[in-house]
Amino acid sequence: MSKLLVVKGHPLTADYSLSLKGLDAFVKAYKAAHPEDEIEELDVFSADIPTLNTELVSAMFAGENAELTASQKDKLARFAGFTEQFLSADKVVIANPMYNLMIPAELKSWVDTVNVAGKTFKYTAEGPVGLANGKKVLHLQANGGVYGAQDPATIYMSAIFNFIGSDFRQIAVEGHAYDPEKTEELLSEFINKVELEAQTF
């Protein structure tokens, strides 16, 4: 039995989101193909993920014997909790829109909890080495324009998850803002792709 972590990176519901429509279709198809697997869901917009602000970063570099505030201790514990949640999953699926050429800020904060030295990668004399080998990561993204996987959001997500050694792949639905009349056609193609991916993911 494997564990799938489902990461919702959109502030709205599937009624207003093509990426979440794809995510819902993926999860439904995945459950049918892998009925014994455990599925855990994470909504980054309601999870109160700590951001890398002054309070958190200063706590990270304070040292073992430093006196931390209760708030700093809480942020460190919650940050580590999201790291461990990612590590405990065998597979991860992430769905998000592209906002201003990038992923939403809340999703970026979650990604920061995933990219952790000593946990998901390590430094060696030959350079950094990923520690998340064998972990499958599927990225579902909706782009209003057509970017052909060359948008900064895709490049960033690919760079991070390849850096930590995971088996990263992406399925995008794009062009619906450029040509709204084709939205249903584009969505149908997207759904077909994610349902097919779910069979063997």
Swiss-Prot record:
Subunit note: Homodimer.
Binding of FMN, residues: S17, L18, S19, M98, Y99, N100, L101
Family: Belongs to the azoreductase type 1 family.
Cofactor note (record): Binds 1 FMN per subunit.
Keywords associated with the record: Flavoprotein, FMN, NAD, Oxidoreductase
Signal sequence bounds: none
Enzyme Commission number(s) from the entry: 1.6.5.-, 1.7.1.17
PANTHER family: FMN-DEPENDENT NADH-AZOREDUCTASE 1 (PTHR43741), FMN-DEPENDENT NADH:QUINONE OXIDOREDUCTASE (PTHR43741:SF7)
Catalytic reaction annotation: 2 a quinone + NADH + H(+) = 2 a 1,4-benzosemiquinone + NAD(+); N,N-dimethyl-1,4-phenylenediamine + anthranilate + 2 NAD(+) = 2-(4-dimethylaminophenyl)diazenylbenzoate + 2 NADH + 2 H(+)
Name of protein: FMN-dependent NADH:quinone oxidoreductase 2
Organism listed in the record: Lactococcus lactis subsp. lactis (strain IL1403) (Streptococcus lactis)
InterPro entries in UniProt: Flavodoxin_fold, Flavoprotein-like_sf, FMN-dep_NADH:Q_OxRdtase_AzoR1, NADH:quinone_OxRdtase_FMN_depd
Function, as annotated: Quinone reductase that provides resistance to thiol-specific stress caused by electrophilic quinones.
Top-level taxon in the UniProt lineage: Bacteria
GO molecular function: electron transfer activity; FMN binding; oxidoreductase activity, acting on NAD(P)H as acceptor; oxidoreductase activity, acting on NAD(P)H, quinone or similar compound as acceptor
Cofactor(s) listed in the protein's UniProt record: FMN
Pfam families to which the protein is assigned, alphabetical: Flavodoxin_2
